[in-house]
Amino acid sequence: MKTLVSQAVSRLARWGTKWSLWPPHLVTACCGVEVGHLFGSAYDAERFGMLPMGSLRQSNILIIEGTITLKMAKFVKYIYEQMPEPKYVVAMGACAIKGGVFYGSYHMVPAAKVLPVHAYVSGCPPTPEGRPKSRDEGPGADSPCRKLSGPST
């Protein structure tokens, strides 16, 4: 009986963790302003269970906004390794996805070469219209990364 209750509680905790995203964001470019809009009154990401966190050890989704340089890549990987499971990565903006204006530069690394990226939000900087588009291009329908773009229309 004790193991049955323990398994049920464990399953409930995993489900709650999966659908309660606590994202810090790694701001290295202008896309950081757009993430601020997510937590503002217009989009109110908190109604979907997303709370902005300052500590990476309590977060389970990392939003990369901007370029990752060669020097910064090992630190970004270290940050990702500190996050608890389940953990997700979102590449936001042209700089994080392909390099933006720095494309082809010797010191720039796309986010997908450093970490496993689960969702992409395109644009420079991504507009509010770009986030719903990411719902259709991202991972499966049950992915918590889809919460970034709010309810589908």
What do these predicted regions represent?
Residues S6, S10, S20, S41, ...:
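Generic serine detector
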Residues M1-Q58:
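N-terminal, charge-rich interaction modules
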Residues A13, Y80-P84, P139-R146:
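Structural signal for hydrophobic packing residues in well-ordered secondary-structure cores
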Residues V33-H37, S41, E46-V114, V121-G130:
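Cofactor-cradling patches in redox/metallo enzymes
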Residues A111-T153:
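C-terminal functional extensions of proteins
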Residues T3, T17, T28, T67-T69, ...:
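Residue-identity detector for threonine
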